[in-house]
Structures are given as structure tokens and as C-alpha cells.
């Protein structure tokens, strides 16, 4: 990446002392402002290795020409609790912003943008013929026989078109997503919780119907289990081998792991904004990274084309993007720009703008995990910056 020179931003970034986070509070404000950048100090984590590269250091870019088009951009970034923001056009960083106390080489938790990384690894294995998307999940993981995954295909898991008894309420301690997190070590385990992620996945039930979208974080961890089974690698090793080592990343990524060493594929990856932008660059380059091909052009084409709009039931998404869909672990807007995004709670975005050959990364620490208010503000920024790029 080629980056122009600039200065810094004065906004205050809270310290650990301001929050004193615990295992049960680190995801909540104000603790999350610190914890999202220091997750390895809260939850056991493993390195997702990059390959050694001899790359020059990068100077920090400013908001520059983008700010000329959007004079209130920095204010909007501050209002939406932005920790890191980056715009990559082609191979040039044309805009970059970091809150005071957060540096370009700091990692940030991606939350569910991690899902898009997992989907990409699955795509690489589909290209190799090691995973057949049409095959049932239990062809690869027979331990899931008798669960809700006994019958659905790998593609239905990728596209989240399975009816599952899984409440994705991030603030309800009785919800399945909270039990999932406790089993993975993200919170203190309660009496009766499954011992680890593998065991948790085998407990999931549902009516067995398919074809209608239901967002469910467990699906991604099932995909990671399939990845482990067909490669013989731990998921963290597969993520390195099939994606991260090919990006010429500045730093290793990290991923949280449970007591068995299973990587929290659906939400546990942390990396720098610049390295996440490299993932987007690879997608816009047809699946090719500096270290070699990651996924086929056909896989990328299918992601950028979007999935089944008829299957989409997420009104929060379609209220903003009426033609939106979800496919292969990516959110597809269906808008005139063809924007596609990896999205994570608390304001994480990896946004692709094919019209301008640009990638936008926004990493944040919203005080609420997942509300229409914050998504509306966030999507407004991403769309306005995309349109501003037309004139840059």
C-alpha cells in the first residue's frame, strides 16, 4: 500500500484504568473501548501467522480529499465511536483516521467480520475440491448427527438459510449466543454450559427447514469445524495457510480460542485496519493476493453478485438496502454500487465499493452491540464516502 504523510487526531482514547474490564464486562461500555484493542489480555488467543515480508513502513494518511468532499466526516467518525478508519483505492490509502491512543499497528477485534474471513477459507477449499457445498454438513462432521445440522448442506450453512433455535440477543444472558460465548471462553461459564464450542454446536436444534435467512453465529463455527476436518489443521492454522499468509500482512492476526484450542471463527479475529483492508483488496482483485491466489474468480463473482433476496428476512438490513441479501458469509447490499460488506457488532465493517475499486474499513466501539440507530449512522458514512470517491 502506498500512503501519503499526515499528522494525528487529538480525540481522547480511554485507558484500561478508565474501565477495569472483567471477563463478564469487557464487551460493555466503557470497557469495550479498551478491550476491543486488547482482547488477548482478556480471552486466550492464538496467532494467525503471516508470512515474513520485507515491506517498508507506512506513513499515516489523512482524511484529505475525502474530507474535502465531506467536511463533517471526522465529526461523524467521532460520533460513531470510531477507533480506526481507512479508505484504500486501488493500492493507495487515500484516507486514514485513528483515535488518540489507537495506532495504525494496533489490532482491533473484528467481531462478525471474522465470518467473512471464514467464508473465504471455505471458498479456497471448495476451489480445491476438498469441500462440496452441496454435500450435507454431516458428511464432513458426523458428530453433528441428531443436531439441527443433520440434513442441511454446507451451502445452506454458508448462506445462513437454516431454521435454528438460536436467539442472537447479545444482551440476554439466557440467549443461545450468550451460552455460545461462555462455552468459547468469552464470559465466565455457568453451571450446565457446554464445556467447549464443539460440544455446544452438537446441542443445537431446530425444525429442520431451510431456504429462509436466519442470522446465526453458530453456522460459522460449524464451517470452521468442517475446515478442520478436511484439512487436518486447527482452524487458526487453516486461516493462516489459506488466507493470512498470502496477504503480505503487516502483522499476525489473532483469534480467541476455547479450552480445546478451537478458534472462535464467527467473531474472535483481531487485526489492524490496514491488514483488514488487504482482505478487501484481495476480493476486488478477483481473489488474488500478493502471496498468491486465495479464492477463484468464480467464488468472488458469486459473492459480489449477491445471494437470494427472496430468502432475506433481516428487516434491519433491508430497511436500508431493499434489495439486500446474504451469501457465503458476506452481506450484499444489492444497491446500484454493488457494495458488499463484512459486518460485526459494535460497529465493525469491511466495505467493498467495486465502482471505485475501493475498500473502506471502519472499526468501532459502539456502546450498544446492534441497534438500527448505529447501523443507520454507520451505513450513512460508508455510502457517503463511497460516493465521495467518485469525485476523488
Swiss-Prot record:
This is 6-aminohexanoate-dimer hydrolase. It catalyses: [N-(6-aminohexanoyl)](n) + H2O = [N-(6-aminohexanoyl)](n-1) + 6-aminohexanoate; N-(6-aminohexanoyl)-6-aminohexanoate + H2O = 2 6-aminohexanoate. PANTHER family: BETA-LACTAMASE-RELATED, BETA-LACTAMASE-RELATED DOMAIN-CONTAINING PROTEIN. The gene is nylB'. It is an enzyme of class 3 (hydrolase). Residues 1-27 are annotated as: Disordered. It comes from Paenarthrobacter ureafaciens. It holds the Pfam family Beta-lactamase. Changing residue 266 to N: Enhances activity.
Amino acid at each position: 500500500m502506498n500512503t501519503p504523510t499526515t499528522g494525528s487526531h487529538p480525540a481522547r482514547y480511554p485507558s484500561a484504568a478508565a474501565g477495569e474490564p472483567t471477563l463478564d464486562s469487557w464487551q460493555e461500555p466503557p470497557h469495550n473501548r479498551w478491550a476491543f484493542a486488547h482482547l488477548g489480555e482478556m480471552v486466550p488467543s492464538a496467532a494467525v501467522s503471516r508470512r515474513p515480508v520485507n515491506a517498508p513502513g507506512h506513513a499515516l494518511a489523512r482524511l484529505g480529499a475525502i474530507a474535502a468532499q465531506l467536511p463533517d466526516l471526522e465529526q461523524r467518525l467521532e460520533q460513531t465511536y470510531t477507533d480506526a478508519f481507512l479508505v484504500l483505492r486501488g493500492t493507495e490509502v487515500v484516507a486514514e483516521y485513528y483515535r488518540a491512543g489507537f495506532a495504525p499497528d494496533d489490532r482491533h477485534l473484528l467481531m462478525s467480520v471474522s465470518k467473512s474471513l471464514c467464508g473465504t477459507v471455505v471458498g479456497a477449499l471448495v476451489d480445491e475440491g476438498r469441500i462440496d457445498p452441496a454435500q450435507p454438513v454431516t458428511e464432513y462432521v458426523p458428530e453433528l448427527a441428531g443436531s439441527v445440522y443433520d440434513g442441511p448442506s454446507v451451502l445452506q450453512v454458508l448462506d445462513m438459510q437454516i431454521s435454528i433455535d438460536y436467539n442472537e440477543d447479545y444482551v440476554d444472558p439466557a440467549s443461545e449466543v450468550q451460552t455460545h460465548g461462555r462455552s468459547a471462553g468469552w464470559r465466565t461459564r455457568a453451571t450446565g454450559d457446554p464445556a467447549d464450542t464443539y460440544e455446544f454446536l452438537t446441542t443445537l436444534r431446530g425444525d429442520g427447514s431451510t431456504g429462509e435467512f436466519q442470522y446465526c453465529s453458530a453456522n460459522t463455527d460449524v464451517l470452521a469445524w468442517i475446515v478442520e476436518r478436511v484439512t487436518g489443521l486447527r482452524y487458526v492454522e487453516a486461516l493462516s495457510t489459506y488466507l493470512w499468509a498470502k496477504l503480505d500482512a503487516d502483522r499476525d492476526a489473532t483469534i480467541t480460542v476455547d479450552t480445546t484450542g478451537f478458534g472462535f471463527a464467527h467473531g474472535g479475529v483481531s487485526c489492524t485496519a490496514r491488514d483488514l483492508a488487504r482482505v478487501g483488496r484481495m476480493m476486488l482483485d478477483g481473489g488474488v493476493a500478493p502471496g498468491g491466489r486465495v479464492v477463484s474468480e468464480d467464488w468472488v463473482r458469486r459473492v459480489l453478485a449477491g445471494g437470494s433476496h427472496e430468502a432475506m428476512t433481516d428487516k434491519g438490513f433491508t430497511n436500508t438496502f431493499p434489495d439486500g441479501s446474504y451469501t457465503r458469509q458476506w452481506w450484499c447490499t444489492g444497491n446500484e454500487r454493488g457494495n458488499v460488506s463484512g459486518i460485526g457488532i459494535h460497529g465493525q465493517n469491511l466495505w467493498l465499493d467495486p465502482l471505485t475499486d475501493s475498500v473502506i474499513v471502519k472499526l468501532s466501539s459502539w456502546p450498544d452491540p446492534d441497534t438500527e440507530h448505529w447501523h443507520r449512522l454507520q451505513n450513512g458514512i460508508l455510502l457517503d464516502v463511497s460516493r465521495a470517491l467518485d469525485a476523488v
